[in-house]
Amino acid sequence: MLKASILFITISLTLMLENSYGKSCRSIGEKCSKTVFDRCCGDSICHLTSPFHGKCVKCLKEGQLCTSDKNCCSDKCNWGKCTKEKHY
């Protein structure tokens, strides 16, 4: 019961904060911070240029930092960077 209450309160606070900031997500080309309060819409990703400062892009180019294959234009994320070559 306590876990459910904490989860409900967390979700409620997140939604209230999101609504107080206006738009709930950013479009391609708009500024983002890669946080729940300032995230990119849909499949776009926040390309950070410094901590919490970036721009929403369709995908990350070769050499940029990534967390998964779907972040990269090449669909290949190897050791945290987008690559051209397939990793094995």
From Swiss-Prot:
Disulfide bonding pattern of the chain: C59-C73, C66-C77, C72-C82
Domain of life: Eukaryota
One of the record's GO cellular component terms: extracellular region
Signal peptide: 1-22
Alphabetized Pfam families for the sequence: UPF0506 (PF11703)
Secreted as UniProt keyword: yes
Compartments it resides in: Secreted
InterPro entries, A to Z: UPF0506 (IPR021712)
UniProt entry keywords in alphabetical sequence: Disulfide bond, Knottin, Secreted, Signal
UniProt free text on domains: The presence of a 'disulfide through disulfide knot' structurally defines this protein as a knottin.
Name of the protein described by the UniProt record: Uncharacterized protein SJCHGC09803
Organism from which the protein derives: Schistosoma japonicum (Blood fluke)
